[in-house]
Each structure stands twice: as structure tokens, then as C-alpha cells.
Amino acid sequence: MSTAFVDQDKQMANRLNLSPLERSKIEKQYGGATTLAFISNKQNELAQILSRADILKIASYDCAAHALQAVLDCGPMLGKRGFSQSDIVKIAGNIGGAQALQAVLDLESMLGKRGFSRDDIAKMAGNIGGAQTLQAVLDLESAFRERGFSQADIVKIAGNNGGAQALYSVLDVEPTLGKRGFSRADIVKIAGNTGGAQALHTVLDLEPALGKRGFSRIDIVKIAANNGGAQALHAVLDLGPTLRECGFSQATIAKIAGNIGGAQALQMVLDLGPALGKRGFSQATIAKIAGNIGGAQALQTVLDLEPALCERGFSQATIAKMAGNNGGAQALQTVLDLEPALRKRDFRQADIIKIAGNDGGAQALQAVIEHGPTLRQHGFNLADIVKMAGNIGGAQALQAVLDLKPVLDEHGFSQPDIVKMAGNIGGAQALQAVLSLGPALRERGFSQPDIVKIAGNTGGAQALQAVLDLELTLVEHGFSQPDIVRITGNRGGAQALQAVLALELTLRERGFSQPDIVKIAGNSGGAQALQAVLDLELTFRERGFSQADIVKIAGNDGGTQALHAVLDLERMLGERGFSRADIVNVAGNNGGAQALKAVLEHEATLNERGFSRADIVKIAGNGGGAQALKAVLEHEATLDERGFSRADIVRIAGNGGGAQALKAVLEHGPTLNERGFNLTDIVEMAANSGGAQALKAVLEHGPTLRQRGLSLIDIVEIASNGGAQALKAVLKYGPVLMQAGRSNEEIVHVAARRGGAGRIRKMVAPLLERQ
């Protein structure tokens, strides 16, 4: 093609306002000049069915002119068959996209008859070699079914670059791998990635050598089951001995290697480990940074940017937190780029770290900059924005809030509801699911607070769907709607519901009641806890634990780990004089496993400082008990200097959130003293669940409450019983109540009780209705 013709085509293609970088990217592909010419000649036709971004995506591959022509030829027919525009772009936007579109047209009917959905077909066709993959699925599906593979297995294997080769490889090597102990699930996991065929053959070749080096079958599957798994296995064999000499454990090597780009990450640990070590990064920190997608780049970026980040006030621990996720390199660079702008908008360093310290942290920071002002105009405060952005998928969550808030408002969801649902992993999907599934759930009798509780956790969208799917069956089994909400309103709620259905009969046969099952299942990780109870119950009984003990231990966040920790540590704790009741008391809370380990670790030092065994059990036997024990060790000397007795310290630390309460006493004690509160008052307010928040609320709202005629004693009474929420409720509704003739004495009497905030709201509700 002549230079003049190419130049002319560049000019014509530029009608799409292609930037120099975009034109260059297209031109570098095989047939790029032809693609530019095609775009310029057919831009009106293309624009009728594709967005600018779609055209660029398809054009960024070899021979893209053919793919774009195929979109024009096949797109309308595929649209009539139910394929979306994003499906068509996904199929066309790869090497061989034209052939893939034609293959979908030709084979979709036959694949549909075999039970493959439109989504399945788009997933398999939308990769390099998609046409060959669809044909291979048709040819090999019967053989796969005969060997016990499900349709989902076939789609997972086929739905990657080189899917056809992966399907053939599975049939070739599955018998041999099966003889070596690899399960069908292992084989699907290894094969179901780009380069799956090579990974399977590499497992076959290297497994004996890896086994001799001490790597388990689980390790091998973890390493092999990623894009580039074959290279990662070779790198483990080549670099493992040197890494072991450097002090890295086998488990650490497997963790670093077991991600996309694992081979490069291992090499980078060897190359940069010494330099990072000199800068003060520990081996554990290096492993944490390296053990993610893009770990090699993250290590290099830490080395490059650490000095500049430290100058900005970021500690090494915070740098590691931001770098130690998928996309950590981009997150660090984005922090450096955007931190000044974020600080100008009143985001604190802690906020920036929370947003950046997740998979996709870079995108989340950019979304905060982009959408923050609009969200503020909609009434969301900085804390709301940080809560929504500070999770995996935070960028998508912020975008979803902007897009869906008007409709959610129409459906009666409040701003706190939206923040609660959006502020988790998968928050964007949860908001979408609330809109799509909410009406059906309301028809079934679930209230708006129920829907928010179910949706407001990691996996909220799946939990809502599971409630719709399983509720009728669960009700037939005798579970009430409040039971269902309690089970699903946690991380992994969908799995917990399924586990209840699957395991309830066996658990009932073992003597567990329905309330027991709900208590165990109704926490984060409830599905695993139910299974662990089934697996470990006999061992617990043999050791003298009652059924009530098992339920108490299992019925919390992390119940599975707590059950295992009790079995592992009970003997040592018994040798140190802790009774079975003590062990159950410590283990039977959120984070019980960590609390048991902390008791073993810190008991000797605490004894030296005069704390009794009963003190230790009281401190450890609450949610966050491990942190509370550590906080006692850290702060006891300073608290002692300030006049707090050992009994005071135990009393403050021995509640949910005890660690935070001790820290709050240290932080706020002097100011509270200046405002007239004595040591006894401070202990009284701090020594409850949520004591830290109560002290902070007294500091913030105490002066205003004093101006309204409340005494110090009144404030202490409210804070010590109703806590921070009760103080805030008195602040908000006190004037309305006093206008209605209620005295301060009456208000304090109502607020200074457990649930005081709710009582105040109930008291004021009729008055607000009249206004």
C-alpha cells in the first residue's frame, strides 16, 4: 500500500477524532492501515451499531477490518437472536473475531439444543480462537459428559484464549492426572485459564519433581490455575531452592507463584528482595506485595516510589497495604498523583489508604476525584464516599450510586441504606439487585430494612437472589422470615442459605435445634461453620464439650476457625489452668480463634503484671478479645501512671471493642478531665460495648448538652447505658421533647438505658407526626 494512500486514510479515520496514540495503536496491528481505511470509509454504518469505544476495541487487533465487516454483516442477525451489543463486541474484539462471529451464527442453534445459553456461547466465542473453540465444544461435548464433566465445566475450560486446545488437552491428560490424585475440579481449575492446555501438560511433566520438593497437590493446582500457570510451575522449580535459601517458606513461594504473572513475581522477589530488605521491608511484607496479580510490577513500584511516598507521610506499613493487592503498582502511582488533590478535598491520609488498599484501588481513587463533587451535592459526606470506595470494586460502586440513586430514592431507600448496600465488595451489583429483585421480595413479605440488611454485605446481590430462590423451601422446613434474614444478612449469606438446606436434616439428626442452626449459620462464613460443626462435633463430644458449647463457639464470625482453634489449643490452655468453660467463653465470640491464640501468647506477661486468669478470660472473652489483650499490654503502664487501677483496666477492656476503648481513654481522658469528668466517670462510660464511641460522643456533644441544662451526672448516665447513639438521639430530639413539655429528667431517664436511642426515637415519633 502506498504511503500517500496510508496518509490519506489516517486523515479520513481522524473524522472519528482518533488521537495520535489511538491511530498508532491500530496501525501497529497486522493490517492496521487497512483497518484505518475501513473505519474511515464505513464510519457512518459502524456508528449506527457501535460506540466509539467499541470500534476502538475491535480495531486494536490484527486484521480488524475483517472483524468490523463481520460486525456489519452478522451483527443485525445476532441481535435478532438475542445477543447484546456488548456480546457482539466481546466476540469480535479478538484475533480471529470475524471467524468467531460467523461461527456463532452457524453454530448457535446446535449449541442451544445442547443446553448452552447465549451467555455461555458469548463467553466461549469471545476469545482468541473463538471459532475453533465453538466447533471443539460441539465435537467434544459428548466425550466430556461421559467422563463426568458438567456443562459449566466445559464453558469454564473453553471460555479463554486457546479454549479449543484446552478442551483437547483435558481429554488427553485427564486419565493420567486422575491416577495421580487430581480431582475433576482440579483439572477444570487448571485448564480454565489462558494457556490452560500448556498448564495441564506442565503439571503432568513437573508434578513428580515438585512433589519431591515438598509441594502438595493443592499447591500445584494453586500455582498452575492462572494465566501463565505453566511458566509459574517452571519458575517454582528453577527458583524455589534459591528462594528457600533466602528464607522464604514453601507456602510463601506457592502464594507468590499462584497468581497471574507468578513466574515474573518469583523472579522479582529474588532480584529486588535484598534492596527492599535494606529499606526495612520484611520478608512477610515482600511476600504480601508479590502475592497478587501484577506482583512483579508492585515490587518494582514500591522500590521506585517509596521515598516519595514516605516524604508525603506514608509509612512502610501503609505502602505495603496499598501495594499488596491486585493492581498494587497502579494504586501506588495513583496515590502519588492524586494525593494532593484528595487532600485539598479534605480526604485524610487514612481515607486515601482505605480507598487505595484494595484490588482496583487506582480506579477507586480516580472515581473519588471524578464523582466526589457530584456525590457531595447529592448529600453524601466524605465518610460515606470513603466507605463506598474503600472496597474491591469501589469505582463501580460509586458509579452505580450516581446512576441509581434517583430510582432508589423513589423506591424509598434512604441515603444511609444506599451507603450500607454500596459499601461492600460487589456494592454496585447489590444496588442493581435491590432494584431488580426488591419488588418480588416485598411481595413475599420482606420489609425494606430486611432487604437492606441482606444486600448490605459482601455478596449482597447473590444473597438477595438466594432468598428469592430458596425462601419457599426454607419456610416449608420451618424457618421463619426473620431466620432467613438473619442467615443471609452476612458475608456469604447466599452460601449460608444453601448450606442450611443441604445440612439441616443431618444436623437435626445430631440433636441440633432449628434455633441452633440459625445461630451458627447467621454469621459471616456461616456455611463453613455449619459444615465444621458436622465434621468436628464427635471430636468435641469426646473431649467433654456439650452441644451448647459447640453452638456458642461456632455461632460467630469466624466460627469455623474458632472450632479448629479450640481443638488445637485446648490441651495447652488446660495445662495453663484454663477450664473448659474459660475456653468456651474466650472462643465463643467474633474472632474467637485469634483470642485463644492471644491468650496463649500473652498470658505469661499479663500474669507478671498482676492480671489474674479470671482477668484474662474477661478481657479475651468478647468480640475483638485478641486486640484487647494486646492493648492492655501496650497501654497498661500509661493508664497506671494516670491513676487507673488494674480493676479499671480490666473493666474497660473486658467488652466488645475493648482495645478501642482503652485507646480512647488515653486519647480523650485529659480533655474529659478538663471538662469536669473524673476517673470514675471515664471508667463508667468506657466500660461498655462501644465505649470508645461513647467517650468520643461525650467530647463532641457534651458542651451542647450542658448548655441545654444536662448535668455531668446526666451525661455519664446516658453514655454509660445508652451509649453514643443515645447521646446523639438526645442531642437531636431533646429540643422537640422539651417543647412538648418533657423535662430533662424524663429525657435522661428514658435515654439512660440499654437501647436508649430507640426509646427516645419512639418517644418523639408521635410529636414529629403532628408537625
Swiss-Prot record:
Cryptic repeat - repeats lie at residues 18-49. The keyword Hydrolase does not apply. Cryptic repeat + repeats lie at residues 742-771. It comes from the Bacteria. After addition of nuclear localization signals (NLS) and a transcription activation domain, can be expressed in both human and plant cells and will recognize and transcribe a target sequence; more than 17 core repeats are necessary for this function. The N-terminal cryptic repeats effect activation, while the C-terminal cryptic repeat is absolutely required. When fused to the FokI restriction endonuclease domain functions as a sequence-specific DNA nuclease in vitro (called TALE-nuclease, TALEN, PubMed:24792163 or BuDN, PubMed:25004980) and with an NLS, in human and yeast cells. Keywords: ANK repeat, DNA-binding, Plasmid, Repeat. ANK repeats lie at residues 216-245, 348-377, 579-608, 645-674. Belongs to the transcription activator-like effector (TALE) family. Bat subfamily. This is Burkholderia TALE-like protein 1. The lineage of its organism: Bacteria, Pseudomonadati, Pseudomonadota, Betaproteobacteria, Burkholderiales.
